[in-house]
Amino acid sequence: MQKRDATTSAMVKVNAKTGEETILLDFNAINPNLDEAELTAEENIAITKDYTGLLFYDDNDLFFYSIPQNKVTRLTNDKDEEVNPMISPDGKKVAYTKNKDLYVVDIESAKETRLTNDASDVVYNGYASWVYMEEIIGRSLNYRAFWWAPNSEMISFLRFDDSPVPKFPLYKADGVHGELEWEHYPKPGDANPIVKMGIAHINTNKVVWIDEDENVDQYTAWPFWSPDSKEMFYQVLNRDQNDLQILSAHPATRKNT
């Protein structure tokens, strides 16, 4: 948790039984090292698991501060927004979506790799369609539909094709006169988006698509990895929502059981 008072600005760990606090990151000590980059430690958007690095989003780009190296690295440098950046478990990479495609950037070299290439107005990779965000994955993920493997070598993600989903007009009360926008919004009985489960292999830049029948009307989501990253589990729920299956997918073979 973050603790801020008249003298302290830090990330602390609190013993629930005794109330004893242990400082994990002293933001007051870090901030002078961020002055040149015009960053503030308290405004980080993510922290590495070992508390040695901070990720920032500033000026429409990603920056990473390494505490051991006392170094700020600009990871991206373009006009496009990096959405839902997630640090890999080993703290060496950051994954995100950009223009509805999935990307990863190496923190040390700032080399960006595009993992998918077919995003469009109706196709999204690692970025949820509206109905999945609202009803399946949940709002708390902010449209994020990708998940790191524990070994940091793979990312499972969902690919959405909204082309069969009817559009629905939504009025936004912005500005003086407001505006009308159109959202792919399935009503009861309408077609849902076509969903595929993919696994992106970071080292080879290859995507493996898990075997599924795209013509079956079902919900595919909620993946989680085994601790050794050898299997990826996910759930499939039929449209009537009375038959839930938990499947195991094998990243190298595409097969599920």
Annotate each predicted stretch with a short phrase.
Residues 1-257:
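Beta-propeller folds
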